Amino acid sequence: MIYQQRNFNIHHIQTSPHKHCYGMGLGVIILDEQYPGFPGDTRNASAYPFPIQYEIAEGLDGKGLLFNADKTSYLAPIQKAAKKLEKIGCRAIAGECGYFAYFQKEIAGYVKVPVFMSSLLQVPLAQNLIGNNQVVGILVFSKNVLTSVHLEAVGIQPNSNYVIEGIMESGLCPEITNLYMASDPLSRGANYEKIEQELITLAVDFYQHHPQMGALLLECSGTQPFARSIQQAIRLPVFSWGTLLDYAYSVAVHREFYGHV
């Protein structure tokens, strides 16, 4: 298993006109603000078994991305970050926040590598896996700012088989809300066990209110470190940033198979 990413057939190398570095993995566009992330968060590279390169979308913070109605000025810094990641040699590009879904089509058309701007890209897949008699629960940071533009940009048909719950609007998750919304960036911090219990409580409540739920999708990258605990509590398939990034890398850099016959 240790050699799954090792290509034993490299006998010659040649300069590529499209990139500066080699052996790269995923490029992740991050917001221009400071907050910490537990292992599994998209801005914490330590938990992922493949290379991650970060680039900041300069001038774009989370509050702007979520709450500003006019997002036209954000496209240029996101495009700039995507182009830099492509130029350095990243095999695929992702966003760090699910609300980057707003720009999925624009960025996918701007670079020549696969683009995975939001974990919401997995909703249509989840819908197809569970059938029309069940719904996909979508747990987002704020449901009040998730629009049809976000949904349609990643292929989600409005009013199809999904239900949405917001972390902020629930009132059940003060610890993780403060991590991202505290006015002083240097005061931002969080306790792992507190967030874990908050998210479990919210997920269980969400499921109990929608017993027809057949899968859960986590939009917020900060919920990824707790995906396993959430799954153990509700016993459903869980789609997250972790499943998206694993998939993105497997598409861009296919592994070899070793075994015996």
Give, region by region, the residue ranges found by the protein language model.
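N-terminal active-site wall of soluble small-molecule enzyme domains
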Residues: T72-A81, Y99-E106, Y110
